[in-house]
């Protein structure tokens, strides 16, 4: 150690591990694996679930506690929060909110099963530029049980909230409240087309928000993307 007496210049083993795995997008290169005692190429979260879906758990779920610090401070665009909004007759719409700008997207989902939800979300997220595909924070709903498939399709890492902790997706919860003006709980959401959902999202994205200094989410996101190298 070059600076043994200066704690500000020290890093923990966890920091080193996380840096290596983030650079390799969760999977280490083979030459690095040879130096690990576990010989494990893909790292399993200490907070992840190893139980099967029969117990209501998500296999290898990565905890919100392991998100990069840049997600929390909202300084960098491309980090999203997501959820399923429920309507009448067991209908649902997937909602996505970008944390930096509060820009939202609404995605039509024919069913709540994980294969259907992941396929619909993947199709929409893949259309975003790479600078807007950094992470997604979701709750513990089994609709994201196939989160690994979503990550493979979009290159977006999924992080899961603690159980019964909706405040950990505050932007999404707040925007869902605004969305209820257009999609009330007693309405069958399956009757809305994707074009109609896009039109509703456009209204919200063009509405000035106090939390953004009365900028609109659309203009905030556009400016952020333009300034991101």
Question: Where does each model-flagged region fall?
Answer:
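RNase H-like two-metal-ion nuclease catalytic core shared by retroviral integrases
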Residues: 138-154, 159-183, 190-202
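Active-site beta-loop-alpha junctions of metal-dependent nucleic acid enzymes
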Residues: 86-89, 106-130
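Conserved short alpha-helical interface segments
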Residues: 1-50
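Short small-residue beta-strand/loop micro-motif enriched in glycine and branched aliphatics
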Residues: 102-107, 160, 185
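C-terminal domain-tail junction helix/linker
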Residues: 185-229
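Polytopic alpha-helical membrane proteins, predominantly small-molecule transporters/carriers
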Residues: 93, 160-161, 206
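Mobile genetic element proteins and their domesticated derivatives, centered on retroelements
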Residues: 16, 83, 96, 102, ...
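Mobile-element integrase/transposase regions
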Residues: 37-94
């Amino acid at each position: 150690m070059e600076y043994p007496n200066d704690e500000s210049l020290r890093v923990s083993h966890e920091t080193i591990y996380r840096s290596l795995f983030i650079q390799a997008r969760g999977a280490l290169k083979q030459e690095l694996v040879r130096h690990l005692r576990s010989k494990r190429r893909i790292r399993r979260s200490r907070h992840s679930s190893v139980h099967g879906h029969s117990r209501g758990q998500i296999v290898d779920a990565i905890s919100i506690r392991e998100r990069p610090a840049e997600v929390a401070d909202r300084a960098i665009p491309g980090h999203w929060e997501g959820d399923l909004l429920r309507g009448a007759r067991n209908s649902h719409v997937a909602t996505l909110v970008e944390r930096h700008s509060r820009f939202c997207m609404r995605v039509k989902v024919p069913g709540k099963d994980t294969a259907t939800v992941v396929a619909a979300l993947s199709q929409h997220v893949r259309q975003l530029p790479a600078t807007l595909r950094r992470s997604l924070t979701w709750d513990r709903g089994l609709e994201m049980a196939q989160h690994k498939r979503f990550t493979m399709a979009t290159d977006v890492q999924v992080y899961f909230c603690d159980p019964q902790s909706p405040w950990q997706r505050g932007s999404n919860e707040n925007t869902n409240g605004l969305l209820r003006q257009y999609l009330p709980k007693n309405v069958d959401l399956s009757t809305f087309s994707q074009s109609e959902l896009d039109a509703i999202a456009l209204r919200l994205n063009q509405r000035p928000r106090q939390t953004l200094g009365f900028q609109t989410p659309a203009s905030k996101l556009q400016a952020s993307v333009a300034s991101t190298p």
